[in-house]
Structures are given as C-alpha cells and as structure tokens.
Design a protein with these regions (language model features):
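N-terminal helix-turn-helix DNA-binding module of bacterial transcription factors
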Residues: 1-62, 330-333, 339-344
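Short hydrophobic/charged patches on amphipathic alpha-helices used for structural packing
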Residues: 53, 107-110, 133, 170, ...
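Acidic, Gly/Pro-rich loop/turn segments at junctions of secondary structure
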Residues: 122-133, 145-155
Length: 344
C-alpha cells in the first residue's frame, strides 16, 4: 500500500503543502476554511504521519537552515528572501549561512546548523559530497538541494535546465553575425558550472562557431573573476565580439571592466548574462539575460523540504530557462533570420 503523505492531504484539500503543514502543526496562522478542508482530507485519506515525522515534531525547533553559495550574489539574495518568507508562512524561521564558494566554510556552517537541531536544511552544495554534506545523509537530516546538485547523491532537488537558455543565447549571437563568442564559465567544482559549460560547448558546436579553447575563461562565480575573464579574453590575438557570463556576479564584474576599458556594451561588444536580476533591465544599455525563476525555485524548495520533514520522498524538479533579449546584445551587423525570442 502506498503511504499517504502531507502532499496528498494538501492536494485533496486544495491548499499548499505549507498551509497543510501549518494546520497539522496547530499553527494559528490559518483560516477556518483551510483547517476544515485539511481536516476533511485527513479523515478521507486516513492520514497518519509516520513515526519518524512524529518524533521530529515532538522535538522540533520550528527552524530550518538555508546555506547559499554567496550572499553577495543577487540571485542567492533573492532566493534567500523567497525561502525565508515561504518558510515563515509555514511556521518556520530560517537560519542563513553563507558558504562564500568555499567548501571549508560550507562544512562549518552545515556543522553549526546540525548542532542547532534545525528541522531540515536547504543547501546549494559545493564540492563532491564529502564532509558535512555526507553528514546530512548519514544523520538522516531532511535535506533539499537548491540550484545545484552533487553527483551520486539521491537528495531531492530543484534546479534549472540551462540547456535551452544557453542554446537560445548562442543562436541569437550567431544570428547577429558573431562567430567568436567568449564564455566566462563557473567553477567546475559545481554542478551548475559543469552543466552550463557543457551546454555552451554543445551550442557552439551546433551553431558551427569557433570552438577555440582560448575563448573560455574559468571563473569562480564572483565579480572579480568576471573582470579577469573579460580582460583575458580581450587580450587574445583574435578577441571575441560577444561575451556570455555564466552567472550574475561575473556579469557585474564583466560590466565593470568593460566600462573601465571604454568598451561600449551593445555597440563594441555584445554581452549576455545567466540569471535575470531585477536591476539588469535598468542598466544602460539594458542587459540581455538567460532567465529562470528564482522565486519559483525558492517556493518549491520549501515545499519539498516540508514533505521530507513529514517523511515523504518528493521528486526532484527541473525548471526551464529562456533568453530575454535586450540592448546589450545588439550589433551593428544585420542579424540573420531566426526563431522569435522573448524581449523585455
């Protein structure tokens, strides 16, 4: 017989998992209608939380941990805000940690969160799954990976399919006449760094563009490496005419050095960033981006963690990405025809 979980109760009651969790935990921040519907669903499904979940509730801290890769990264700042608000609505406070893209700092924060006996942890993991990441598994602490994963670990996750957005970006630049596209990659110690680099390599090959390895600079998802990457790429004997930065902070670094060098973005050189930060659209010129919903990612991560805390085994979720064309990837050459893309 298939075990009934809180996700089933929420679906039958027509409420979110967070609302069902609040009702079942006795949180007063619920409406009479929601309480009635959840109670009816519990009765109809004969829902009985498993022993592990009951034990967790009897000693719970009403807190969760969130460990992000770099709090300076606008993407992770937005993610933290969404997670904090969604968790609070479900009756949990969020303890935030910053790994600063360093494994030893990641381990220190995870050890601290474990010692604080949080009810579950959402983490954007770095590394190969050793150290404190492994401790989460051996101690059976409810865990959800967000944005990134670790190869070989069966942890529920919510991530982004980078393939479509990167393919659209390369096609857009190729259609505009660019044949040498510089790529500022994320670190290969992260799943996103590896996946996005692989997607870029496939897209370049499919478009028949130059696969010169010198056109790739491996950064570390921090602004300084974005600046260093642009500087290195522009020193090539045949420099690129377009750039694709694999995340928002490296894009910020790229913008800074291009301004310093007097290179006009959108006129002298095209630039596209992975991640759509709100103020990217306000720049002059507005920045073309590969967009994916950080708000949806955060909400889903919290819902998944609540299911794991309840003893459930949610399926991992992969969100889509898409190119948003703005002025930063305009070009003086006449673009070839291609599929229509979202503009904003």
């Amino acid at each position: 017989m298939v075990a009934i979980t809180i996700k089933d109760v929420a679906a039958l009651a027509g409420v979110s998992v967070a609302t069902a969790s609040r009702v079942l935990s006795g949180n007063p921040a619920t409406s009479p209608d929601s309480r009635a519907r959840v109670a009816a669903a519990v009765t109809e499904l004969d829902y009985r939380p498993n022993a592990q979940a009951r034990a967790l509730r009897s000693t719970r801290s009403d807190s969760i941990g969130l460990l992000v890769s770099d709090v300076r990264n606008p993407f992770f700042a937005d993610l933290a805000h969404t997670v904090e608000q969604a968790a609070l609505a479900a009756g949990y406070v969020t303890l935030l940690g910053n790994a600063n893209e360093r494994k030893e700092q990641q381990d220190r924060y995870l050890d601290t969160l474990i010692s604080r006996r949080v009810d579950g942890i959402i983490v954007a993991p770095l590394g190969d799954g050793s150290g404190s990441i492994r401790s989460l598994i051996t101690r059976e602490i409810p865990t959800v990976f967000v944005d990134r994963t670790v190869d070989g670990l069966e942890i529920p996750s919510v991530t982004t399919d980078s393939e479509a957005g990167i393919r659209q970006a390369v096609h857009h630049l190729a259609a505009a006449g660019h044949t040498r596209i510089g790529y500022i990659s994320g670190p290969q110690a992260t799943s996103t760094g590896r996946d996005r680099f692989a997607a870029f390599t496939r897209a370049i090959a499919a478009a028949g563009l130059s696969q010169d390895p010198e056109l790739v600079y491996f950064g570390d998802y921090q602004a300084a490496s974005g600046s260093a990457g642009v500087h290195a790429l522009l020193q090539l004997r045949e420099p690129p005419t377009a750039l694709l930065a694999a995340d928002s902070l490296m894009a910020v670094g790229a913008i800074a050095i291009l301004h310093k060098l007097g290179r006009r973005i959108g006129a002298d050189i095209a630039l596209i960033a992975f991640d759509d930060i709100e103020w990217f659209a306000l720049l002059n010129p507005a920045l073309s981006v590969i967009s994916h919903s950080v708000e949806e990612m955060g909400r889903i991560a919290v819902d998944m963690l609540l299911q794991v805390i309840d003893g459930g085994k949610p399926e991992s979720v992969v969100l889509p990405s898409e190119l948003i064309v703005r002025a930063s990837s305009s070009t003086p050459t006449s673009p070839a025809s291609g599929p229509s893309l979202r503009t904003n």
